């Protein structure tokens, strides 16, 4: 059966006890951090309500609440227990935010981290990502946001932790810190403070996972396969876990723990990202080698055209692959072609 993806998104209650969670104090913070990007505000708000309103004990209670009201979910699973058995991170306040690439995931991650620290929901935030490149980019963005005077001025007086220190796991993770690390560092026996800083303290730690589809899908990289095991490790006993991705699919199946979705189509319609022009694959050549050369010719000709048309901005052509090994192979093939 084919489902409409939006129908599979779990809806977070908008009616909750304001005495338990007061987000009105954070309105100015939302406005300065997100500007007019309402979808970012909505995503942060839904995440914080899920984690901090007291309406949910775990992802299971959110599923139960939605399953009763949603016919599409009832068609996807034979009953609510069947649904709950298939959750990837059970018995946690765990969920995924599906945000199209290029729509500002880093703002969401920072916003959720700062509010969770400010509300005293947690003492520390651990942001995990799959590579050094992503780690470096996130740290740089977070340092700018944490040091932004306009953002600082919006933080409520009641906020417990303000202007969090942005560190990596080479430093001891203290209360009020946002630690940004790539998943490989979690398994290094020397140099990483994650074990010492977080063991037995997981219930007071928020774990935010960038590019979370790496956890849910099979990978040839051993450390990536261990990522999920780390999140479920009883030695840490993490309670609050969120994932962020622009590709919330396991093979062709949409993730079953998504609480907010902002699709690429919606982003294009809202002019948040540019329209995507797809190159159709020709079936003229039967040989895989010939097809690859034809594809490279198209890409090269396209690049040359952009160089002429946009000569003042040095156009880049970016080739995206499934993983590092495929990228290395593609690099060699492209060098041979050129």
Cite the ranges covered by each PLM segment.
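Conserved pre-motif I regulatory segment
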Residues: 13-98
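Conserved Walker A/P-loop ATP-binding site and its immediately adjacent core
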Residues: 108, 121-153, 321-331
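Conserved interdomain linker/interface between the two RecA-like ATPase lobes of SF2 helicase motors
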Residues: 256-338
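Short basic/glycine-enriched coil/helix segment immediately N-terminal to the Walker B
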Residues: 87-91, 172-176, 190-207
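SF2 helicase catalytic motif II
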Residues: 185, 198-236, 240
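Inter-Walker segment of RecA-like/P-loop motor cores
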Residues: 149-191
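Conserved helicase ATPase motor motifs in RecA-like P-loop NTPase domains
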Residues: 97-103, 211-215, 230-253, 271
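Conserved SF1/SF2 helicase motif Ia
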Residues: 94-103, 108-136, 312-313
């Amino acid at each position: 059966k084919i489902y409409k993806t939006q129908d599979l998104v779990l809806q977070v209650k908008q009616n909750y006890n304001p005495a338990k969670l007061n987000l009105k104090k954070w309105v100015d913070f939302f406005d300065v951090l997100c500007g007019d990007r309402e979808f970012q505000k909505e995503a942060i708000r839904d995440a914080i309500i899920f984690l901090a309103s007291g309406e949910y004990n775990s992802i299971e209670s959110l599923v139960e609440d939605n399953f009763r009201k949603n016919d599409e979910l009832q068609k996807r699973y034979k009953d609510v227990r069947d649904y709950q058995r298939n959750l990837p991170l059970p018995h946690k306040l765990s969920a995924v935010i599906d945000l199209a690439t290029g729509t500002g995931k880093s703002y969401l991650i920072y916003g959720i981290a700062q509010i969770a620290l400010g509300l005293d929901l947690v003492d520390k935030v651990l942001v995990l990502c799959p590579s050094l490149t992503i780690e470096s980019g996130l740290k740089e963005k977070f340092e700018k946001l944490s040091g932004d005077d306009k953002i600082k001025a919006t933080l409520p007086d009641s906020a417990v932790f303000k202007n969090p220190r942005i560190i990596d796991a080479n430093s001891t993770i203290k209360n009020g810190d946002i630690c940004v690390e790539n998943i490989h560092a979690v398994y290094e026996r020397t140099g990483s403070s994650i074990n010492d800083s977080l063991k037995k303290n997981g219930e007071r730690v928020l774990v935010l996972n960038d590019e979370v589809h790496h956890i849910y899908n099979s990978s040839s990289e051993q450390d990536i396969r261990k990522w999920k095991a780390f999140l479920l490790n009883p030695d840490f006993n993490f309670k609050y876990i969120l994932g962020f991705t622009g590709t919330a699919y396991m093979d062709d199946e949409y993730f079953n723990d998504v609480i907010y979705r902002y699709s690429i189509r919606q982003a294009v319609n809202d002019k948040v990202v540019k329209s995507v022009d797809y190159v159709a694959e020709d079936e003229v050549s039967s040989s895989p080698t010939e097809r690859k050369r034809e594809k490279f010719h198209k890409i090269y000709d396209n690049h040359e055209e952009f160089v002429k048309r946009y000569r003042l901005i040095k156009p880049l052509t970016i080739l995206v692959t499934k993983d590092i090994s495929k990228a290395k192979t593609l690099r060699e093939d492209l060098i041979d072609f050129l």
